[in-house]
């Protein structure tokens, strides 16, 4: 458990580091020009452009080679299911750890086994998780591995066959959820419609959007932008913003592909 409440600072990053934060199909200027000439390739956008469009509500895990490799394995169509689940669980754990770092802490003093006083911090009470079924359930174990006693609610949202709009079929939350900080778990943000409906249900239960931290692994610019436009006070934490989201995640993780 971290002993500090570190905030991600995406505005002060160097151009070189920023270029590694958000990656699209092509990363060089020449490749970006190629993308514009090829309608099948996603358009290149820089980190600063994404943050101007979406705002500070979007927080990215600092990119390193470990995260980049996990992203690559998850996206690779030749990856076995065993390796897929293993790498997905590792990436989920990293996202959950940083999500916990966004929750409020309070200072405390403890006594060490040698009798010395130590000034530290501890979580403030009143946190819970909510998974959007089914793919969001893949993130539950990662949260429980970090917070053994945390309460987790569930919500099931599917597209209506006639209207194609997101429809809530099941929702169960802790009775006092309106007073809690919520880690909302949904690994892939594609259109953002499912998350928007889930947040709408949570706000109908009295929860303020500013108390919701959305944990995801991958997001499209459109998905993140749509969510922030609908709920400007929400926080979105993800590892990558890319024009193409690995929408096969749920099927691969649960072995139904």
Swiss-Prot record:
Alphabetical list of SUPFAM superfamilies matching this protein: PRTase-like (SSF53271)
Compartment list: Cytoplasm; Nucleus
Matching InterPro entries: PRibTrfase_dom, PRTase-like
GO cellular component, one term: cytoplasm
Xref: Pfam families: UPRTase (PF14681)
GO molecular function, one term: GTP binding
Disulfide-linked positions: none
Keywords: Cytoplasm, GTP-binding, Nucleotide-binding, Nucleus
Amino-acid positions noted as binding GTP in the UniProt annotation, renumbered to this chain: 81, 90, 124-127, 151, 180
Ligand binding (uracil): 247-249
Binding annotation for 5-phospho-alpha-D-ribose 1-diphosphate: 134, 186-194
Keyword presence, Transport: no
Family under the similarity heading: Belongs to the UPRTase family.
Stated name of the protein: Uracil phosphoribosyltransferase homolog
Organism: Danio rerio
Taxonomic lineage of the native organism: Eukaryota, Metazoa, Chordata, Craniata, Vertebrata
């Amino acid at each position: 458990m971290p002993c500090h409440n570190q905030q991600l600072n995406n505005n002060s990053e160097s151009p070189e580091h920023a270029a590694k934060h958000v990656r699209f199909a092509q990363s060089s200027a020449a490749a970006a020009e190629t993308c514009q000439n090829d309608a099948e390739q996603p358009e290149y956008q820089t980190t600063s452009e994404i943050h101007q469009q979406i705002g500070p509500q979007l927080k990215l895990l600092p990119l390193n080679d470990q995260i980049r490799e996990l992203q690559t394995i998850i996206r690779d169509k030749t990856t076995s299911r065993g390796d897929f689940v293993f790498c997905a669980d590792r990436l989920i754990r990293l996202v959950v750890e940083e999500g916990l770092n966004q929750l409020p802490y309070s200072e405390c003093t403890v006594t060490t086994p040698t009798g010395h006083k130590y000034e530290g911090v501890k979580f403030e009470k009143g946190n819970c998780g909510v998974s959007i079924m089914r793919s969001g359930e893949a993130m539950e174990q990662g949260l429980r591995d970090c917070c053994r006693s945390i309460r987790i609610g569930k919500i099931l949202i599917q597209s209506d066959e006639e209207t194609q709009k997101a429809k809530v079929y099941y929702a169960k939350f802790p009775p006092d959820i309106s007073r809690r900080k919520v880690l909302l778990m949904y690994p892939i943000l594609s259109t953002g419609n499912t998350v928007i409906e889930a947040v709408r249900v949570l706000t109908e239960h009295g929860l303020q959007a500013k108390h919701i931290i959305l944990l995801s692994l991958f997001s499209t610019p459109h998905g993140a932008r749509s969510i922030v436009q609908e709920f400007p006070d929400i926080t979105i934490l993800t590892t990558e913003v890319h024009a193409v989201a690995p929408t096969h995640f749920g099927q691969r993780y649960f072995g139904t592909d």
